[in-house]
Amino acid sequence: MRLGMVIDLQKCVGCGGCSLACKTENNTNDGIHWSHHIATTEGTFPDVKYTYIPTLCNHCDDAPCVKVCPTGAMHKDKRGLTLQNNDECIGCKKCMNACPYGVISFNAATPHRRWQDDSEVVANGTVSPLMLLKRTGATATPNENPERGDTYPMIRPKRTTEKCTFCDHRLDKGLNPACVDACPSEARVIGDLDDPQSKVSQLIKLHKPMQLKPEAGTGPRVFYIRSFGVKTAY
């Protein structure tokens, strides 16, 4: 099995719902985005073209982050996903430097530490972040998802790296990654690239797919088909 993803740019509306769903599902800290995007604006008024390409870990066949990791923290699982054993991460950032896509993040500070602030924004008028955290019964952030902790630390610790896992904890339960289910236009499909009958394989066969930075030779498993269709003319 080789899990991969197809993103149909013609269906994508650039809403960012995938990124919001990812942050909610995976408890990522401020400024850390497992699901992100490349947005470009071309042309001059009144003929302007806007393009939006969602990005995430490509779970490459020949993942450079796995090759350079000195402890084996970055590794491949039986589905071909590029995963990380956070307990073995020493924070050396070699994986970050090796990744040609810039999709690996580093926790330079303790994640979600703003929720440990016990000062009220408005004295006697609002609760403090810490008070709100305690009222929800959460440990790190009020909207934390404990299910993320099934296969990976629920909150990744300071001085470790982290990245998209294709929501492996959801895959284990037969569910799609959060970004796939959240997409309002169903632009994302995940499936087995080794199965010629899978939807991802059929889409790749039907359309001429694109991969990000193919010249890097990493064998990315995220494929893009068709083109983002927003063009504004006044």
Curated annotation (Swiss-Prot):
GO cellular component: periplasmic space
Keywords, sorted A to Z: 4Fe-4S, Electron transport, Iron, Iron-sulfur, Metal-binding, Periplasm, Repeat, Transport
CC cofactor: [4Fe-4S] cluster
Chain ranges of the 4Fe-4S ferredoxin-type domain: 3-32, 48-79, 80-109
Chain sites annotated for binding [4Fe-4S] cluster 4: C69, C89, C92, C95
Induction, per UniProt: The arrA-arrB operon is induced under anaerobic conditions in the presence of nanomolar concentrations of arsenite or low micromolar concentrations of arsenate. Expression is repressed under aerobic conditions and in the presence of nitrate. The peak of expression occurs during the exponential phase of growth.
Details of cofactor binding: Binds 4 [4Fe-4S] cluster.
pH relationship of activity: Optimum pH is 7.5.
Reported function: Component of the arsenate respiratory reductase (Arr) complex, which catalyzes the reduction of arsenate (As(V)) to arsenite (As(III)). ArrB is probably the electron transfer subunit. The periplasmic localization of this complex may allow the cell to couple arsenate reduction to energy production before arsenate can be transported to the cell cytoplasm and enter the ars detoxification pathway, an energy-requiring process.
Protein name as annotated: Arsenate respiratory reductase iron-sulfur subunit ArrB
Originating species: Shewanella sp. (strain ANA-3)
